[in-house]
Amino acid sequence: MAADESPASPSELSECFSAEDYAAESLAADLDPWITFDARKTPRAEFSSWLQSHRPSSVSRYGDGEAGAGPVGWIAVRGPDYSEQSGDVEGLQDSWETLLTSGRSVSFQNIRELALNHSVLDGKWLMHLDTGFKVDRAWESIARATVLEGKIWSAKVSPRDPSSNSRHVICVYNQNFTDEEQVVRLDSAIRAAGVKCVLYYKPDVYTYLGIYRNNRWKLCPTIYESMFDLESVPRRSHILNKVTNLELS
């Protein structure tokens, strides 16, 4: 899984930071140690105690020297059907450099073509939550749906950053961002877990290519937005394709 968006929500991110700043921050988190529960390797009987011991609001991003705890990049869970499939990232980045030097326009369609050519197809729904009860409750629901129910492939959450006012980000993954039905099914699984907040969907190819907020190509860093409608019967998500500006039916 690649590094992701800042824990701050899109509306909170400062215009003074460049896409390169956000990419560097995310890469640093990705390279630091992760706390991971892998349902393929660890008995499920140990999951509840693991979950309680590693609540995102109580795990410090930069560790605790007095307690002998080191930095933590992410807290992650992997479901029983999880498999590593990052594709040909090096080839993707080489093709990206070729595109940039060719003079061709940079667009979602061109990037989608690169992703398909190099099998870099993972994507994730992102949610931004305040530290404390809100993030701990949402993370517990997502993690249980991943490890115990197998409804979600994999997920991760950022630990608490005591040095800033940034919120936590939870990333919930699927295997193919070009499969619209799969993207919608993952949204449904997240909503079934009890999450009602706004969600944003980002393909991993954007992350690998450094496409964050304030990028020089002026691309929106997310391609779907999901708003949960509490008043509809039955309750449902309204998912907007931000590339076409059309709502998914």
Swiss-Prot record:
InterPro entries: Bles03, TIF_eIF4e-like
Source superkingdom: Eukaryota
Entry similarity comment: Belongs to the UPF0696 family.
Name this protein carries in UniProt: UPF0696 protein C11orf68 homolog
Organism, as annotated: Danio rerio (Zebrafish)
Organism lineage string: Eukaryota, Metazoa, Chordata, Craniata, Vertebrata
